[in-house]
């Protein structure tokens, strides 16, 4: 009996120490079959983050429209930032999302739009929600499977959700400046951008953060824009030198693309210690004390 109690206590400590919400009630990534089977669950909120006109043309039955642009906003000179706390709370409330809701974020497709869905999902998790998922393959996967669509406008009653910010999901500039030479950084952008052959106009420097490891976000997806098997993602990350025991920081140009890696590593794989840098290259490249590196691997 004493041994059993000791083992139980050890198991609980392991779960608590993992940093992963073991109370999660839904998978971090759901497929069409799962979503169809759960459409009538009263806990479910299907959050359609496509453009309003796309939603009106047809959507998953019961889905609520909440355009992506409301979840990633311009703040001063920076693009695609987390909304101010009061705006974020109001946004969640207006979608009818409660603390115990099962939220499935739906974009137009997987592939090039996958990180739009994960950006919203990451923001919801950052806000304190536990049961959030993204639809693998997006709305395109739903229609390709021949599932029912609706044109009925859905408006849920506003909730009374209150924020419970998880600061350890976010890396800000101060955190980055303190840890740039000590923690592993994952660059989610393309090879060409990482090496400095190309860059976006609003990013002041070419290349990548000193010491950052290149892992384009597209590597987690197959030719149809759906997730590759979990084992392949773990194999890839391990081969690149990342491990579950490390604290990892992901970044890209604006904090959108890197949310895909954050979501997959933290929520899908269950690695507990990872942050997403919302300001990303757009912010850090403006700092004269940081010199980006070009045409080298690290």
Question: What residue spans do the PLM features occupy?
Answer:
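C-terminal soluble interaction/assembly domains
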Residues: 235, 245-298
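Positively charged n-region of N-terminal signal peptides that target proteins for export
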Residues: 1-6
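Short hydrophobic beta-strand that contains or immediately precedes a catalytic carboxylate
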Residues: 35, 45-50, 66, 185-187
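Bacterial N-terminal signal peptides
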Residues: 7-18
